[in-house]
Amino acid sequence: MKGNFLWKKWGSILCCLGVIGGCFLHTAWRGEDAIFPMMDAVIVLDAGHGGWDPGRKGTAGVDEKELNLAVVEKLADYLEQGGAEVILTRESDDALGGKKQSDMAERKKIANESGADILVSIHQNAFPSPKAKGAQVFYHNNSGNGKVLAECVQESLRSRVDGSNQRQAKENKDYYILRTTEIPAVIVECGFLSNAEEERLLNDDTYQEKLAWAIYCGILDYFEKSSII
């Protein structure tokens, strides 16, 4: 992923200069560390679903699993360029098990054996009402650091992607990946595939870059607040 990042992403980065500039200014106080602000961080990125499990299906037929992996790949590029070690639960359109239970158990195993600082799981939302929209971040109700991470990412998504999004980071006690991982973990629902306009945006490469950058900046804000790295 690292080799040709600047060339491969240049066009999309130009489109995101406004939000990018804001995040670099946010880290400038760290001096030369701002060149690699994620140095020493280890992060697990989980692209939800995959293979036989397509996840949600959009109004135009887009499979959630494809969008999840696309955002994860872009986010991984940003994190690695920032100096982080990134561990992916999947790198292609493959499930991690033949059934949902074994698939989720393998994701948990990867996270818990990784020695990582955090886990970020990327998903897309859906709702019966086609009007529902906006990214939202979930954390486990018993994870204090998970809450801080979720709030940092939620605020970054609001300020860098959609200022009209009034959704707040939300606790959840039932999501498997949140309740079984031993490190701070969040699920980022990037938007609603049940909303035709938001589905169109989520399927757009430049918008995916914008989402990935906002999540990256939220993660960086978390590490600055927690002083983990």
Feature names for model-found ranges:
Residues 1-229:
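Catalytic-site microenvironment of enzymes
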